[in-house]
Amino acid sequence: MSDVITIGIAGGTGNGKTTITRRILDEFGGDVSVLYHDNYYKRHDDIPFPERKKLNYDHPNAFDTPLLVQHLDALRAGQTIECPTYDYTVHNRAAETITVTPAKVIVVEGILIFAEPELRERLDIKLFVDTDADVRILRRIVRDVRDRGRDLESIVTQYLTTVKPMHEMFVEPSKRYADIIIPEGGHNQVALDFVMERIRAYVKERD
């Protein structure tokens, strides 16, 4: 499927990446497949739950990126894949998988996807969502309490010990690889409209 377009959406935690992914889904509907880097956290069956809670999940080594690259290549070749899923309540990969079918537009979303050369080189359009750190941590707190069963103390501890340092070490430097930087994430309507127009043009070029 040489006409496939692969879009990478990166940036710090809680910065609005998913809002932009939804906008692309709304625009292209069934012609979009999405791969979330978060689903490719490594399996830790041999580590007790209390110890899994202490792992650094914001370092590139936390992810099974080679599997994501393999799955991305398969989708680009027109093959269906079984994507892993991750259970945040137990800090481990879940037994269930998600069937992802090939599509004209493939979106890869994650905080560290631009920090991985083998993944980065497969992306036709690279978008980096840039949002103020205070806004990002507030969004993360709301999300983790509401959707992931976390308590406030554990969220703040994780943010200060791993999330913030890893953002400064890996996420922020990877911004230089972006084709387009979107300030204020999904709330920047002007930037979103510009990005969507660019994607439409790219799709048209491949038709």
Segments (PLM) and residue ranges:
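ATP-dependent NMP and nucleoside kinases share a basic, alpha-helical "lid"
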Residues: 94-148
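Conserved nucleotide-sensing/catalytic segment adjacent to the nucleotide-binding pocket
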Residues: 33-34, 42, 46-90
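Hydrophobic positions on the alpha1 helix immediately C-terminal to the Walker A/P-loop
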Residues: 20
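NTP-dependent small-molecule kinase module
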Residues: 101-102, 142-145, 164-207
